[in-house]
Every structure is written in structure tokens, then in C-alpha cells.
């Protein structure tokens, strides 16, 4: 567990040092297993499901909040007041979560980790 935590810490530090990508946005991509390890070793994060409310209600990761990708625009997001807090982003298959991560980065959020879609999520899920 200590090695996994050290690996994640290194990953986070490296992501903070990387140059922005071609689109000018900066977020890290991690695996679902890395997201689980982060959730097990930290409490200072928020899980954001960027699917539609209907998809979210069918099945989502426990404690995730639903902010549909289509609603992330150019203004502040009330559910995410701390722009430095770790934001773990996912969708169904990974496409919308990448788009949302780029938009969040453009809004000034600095600690974003995108981990794909719930289709490949090995952990627990709940429904509304």
C-alpha cells in the first residue's frame, strides 16, 4: 500500500510539472485502479460523473456528484468551489470525461485526474 501511495504521489507531482498539451489544457489521465488507490489513501478529493442525470441515476460511483459535461461552460461551477482540490472525472466510456477535464482545466482547475468510464470501473457502484 505504501508503494502504491508513493507511486500516486509521484504521478501527481509529475503531472504538476508537465508542460501543457497541444490544446493548452493540463489534466492527468489515470487508470481506474489508480483512482481507487487514491480514494483509499486520501480524503481530499471530489468524484465528478459527467454523464447525463439519467445515466447517473442508473449507476454511479458512491459519493460521486453529477455535473453533466454539457453544463460545464465558461463560468464558475458552484459544486466545485476549490480550484486546487483533486477532481476525479469519469463518464461512460472516457470521451466526455476527457472533454470535461479539458473544460475544467480551461476554467482554472489545477488538480484534475480523468480515469475513463464507468464501463471499465472495477469498484463498487450504486443507483438512485
Give the residues covered by each predicted segment.
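Rhodanese-like catalytic fold shared by cysteine-dependent sulfurtransferases
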Residues: 2-8, 13-38, 54-86, 92-128
